[in-house]
């Protein structure tokens, strides 16, 4: 657990550099720090993805990597998942 509040290292509008994987080139549409996970929950548009283009990820501040992706065909579905992930 953290000794203080989580400070986000990513902002809306950021284009992820990634590592050549699915997150590379994705645009952050929304982000919110998650104190429990010491990371951010992010909603992105990843048009080059071989999956559906809207995705929620957990973004690790320390490594700068995304993981636990949930993919959706529409922004609305992605946003609903973003809100759910913030509550869990």
Regions found by a protein language model. Name each.
Residues 31, 69-70:
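Residue-level detector of high-confidence beta-strand sites
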Residues 71-88:
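A short, charged, amphipathic alpha-helix used as a generic interaction element across diverse proteins
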Residues 2-55, 79:
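Short N-terminal "domain-start" leader segments
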Residues 40-68, 84-87:
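Short aromatic-glycine-(Arg/Gly/Cys) micro-motifs in beta-strand/loop hairpins
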């Amino acid at each position: 657990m953290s000794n203080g509040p989580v400070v986000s290292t990513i902002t809306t509008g950021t284009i992820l550099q990634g590592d050549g994987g699915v997150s590379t080139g994705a645009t952050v549409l929304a982000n919110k720090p998650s104190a429990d996970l010491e990371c951010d929950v992010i909603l992105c548009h990843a048009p080059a993805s071989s999956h559906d283009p809207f995705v929620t990820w957990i973004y690790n501040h320390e490594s700068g990597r995304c993981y636990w992706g949930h993919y959706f065909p529409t922004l609305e579905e992605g946003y609903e998942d973003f809100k759910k992930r913030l509550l869990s």
